[in-house]
Amino acid sequence: MAIEILVPDLPESVADATVATWHKKLGDTVKRDEVIVEIETDKVVLEVPALSDGVLAEVVQAEGETVVSKQLLGKISTAQEGDVSSATLKATNEPTPSDRQNAAIENSHNHNADQSPVIRRLLAEHDLQADQIQGSGVGGRLTREDIEREIAKRQAQQVKQEAATEQNTISTVAYSARSEKRVPMTRLRKRIAERLLEAKNSTAMLTTFNEVDMQPIMTLRKTYGEKFEKQHSVRLGFMSFYIKAVVEALKRYPEVNASIDGDDVVYHNYFDISIAVSTPRGLVTPVLRDCDKLSMAEIEKQIKALAEKGRDGKLTVEDLTGGNFTITNGGVFGSLMSTPIINPPQSAILGMHAIKERPIALNGQVVIRPMMYLALSYDHRLIDGRESVGFLVTIKELLEDPTRLLLEI
């Protein structure tokens, strides 16, 4: 008996998807609920599990193929493995990209079968074997950091070897030895490119700047951070302060929490904040909903959960849908200042940056304070200068006096 492997139902906003990775090759034994193939949309990666024990007998759609909801991907034979005739396994004589990838991971399959999809993909992409890397996770499981350390170690060794080789052969290296590599863009990267270009072409985007003294928040975190973490089991970060300040500013300036729909302006009376998160696949913006009703501990917990889902490739379409305003924190990468791009149909985005000690004038004295630049990009079709500057000044004042955030004044 053959069990069909079908593309799962795609959201209404997603027209099609791409076959990203086959984790099994023809003839491999599969177990019920084991992930056998991943489907990539322009937002998330969907895992397709086996519906029954059996053998992968047919692959209809190879990696890189475009598919739609309920389209046939392959078939699983539920007969005994020994009874499956090789004649029923439909494969071409010429190795496909899927065959080559499966061959690369076959030797390490038994060691990484219980790893997350993201870990398995990283192992395959960098030609690594799980049994050659010391895992630091629970039960010896590999983490992303383990793989990154291994990649960095190998790269360092490669650089050292290349330097030694170059020293001996530099005089004989020809100019023609330079090379290029062309790879197709992922669906997510193509979607990001489309959205960024759309934002630049369809909005009257402008950016206004300010700076904030972060000393009060840093003092508060130093004083209460340990107690906060002990009581709530989550670290007190900066983002909860940023979100609380943004929500209060949005209440005072509803134009920033609005969007343009044709000739109408839609004012939102709820506060769903998108948070820019860097993932192995690219930058995504999962949404924290009803932020005005969340405590700082709840905000920190939700941010942590969304960040972990992003790193593990577990974000759902629902996690990424909606949002009335976006916060992006380039400071985690060391950015001192930037002009963030609006995330349509939203009308504004707030950029936070690196906190740096700088000399400033305070009460007639030059003092050293931890300062951070703020950048608000906004759609000038809807938001005027008075509202944009007032919005940013409100955030500055709230962050410089965090007690007002807690008292909601």
Swiss-Prot record:
Gene Ontology CC terms: cytosol; oxoglutarate dehydrogenase complex
Active site: 380, 384
Residues of the Lipoyl-binding domain: 2-77
Cofactor: (R)-lipoate
Top enzyme category: transferase
EC number: 2.3.1.61
Sequence positions bearing N6-lipoyllysine: 43
One Pfam family of this chain: 2-oxoacid_dh
Polar residues compositional bias, start-end: 83-107
Stretches assigned to the Peripheral subunit-binding (PSBD) domain: 114-151
Assembly mode: Forms a 24-polypeptide structural core with octahedral symmetry. Part of the 2-oxoglutarate dehydrogenase (OGDH) complex composed of E1 (2-oxoglutarate dehydrogenase), E2 (dihydrolipoamide succinyltransferase) and E3 (dihydrolipoamide dehydrogenase); the complex contains multiple copies of the three enzymatic components (E1, E2 and E3).
Function: E2 component of the 2-oxoglutarate dehydrogenase (OGDH) complex which catalyzes the second step in the conversion of 2-oxoglutarate to succinyl-CoA and CO(2).
Protein name (Swiss-Prot/TrEMBL): Dihydrolipoyllysine-residue succinyltransferase component of 2-oxoglutarate dehydrogenase complex
Originating species: Haemophilus influenzae (strain ATCC 51907 / DSM 11121 / KW20 / Rd)
Taxonomic lineage of the native organism: Bacteria, Pseudomonadati, Pseudomonadota, Gammaproteobacteria, Pasteurellales
Gene name of the record: sucB
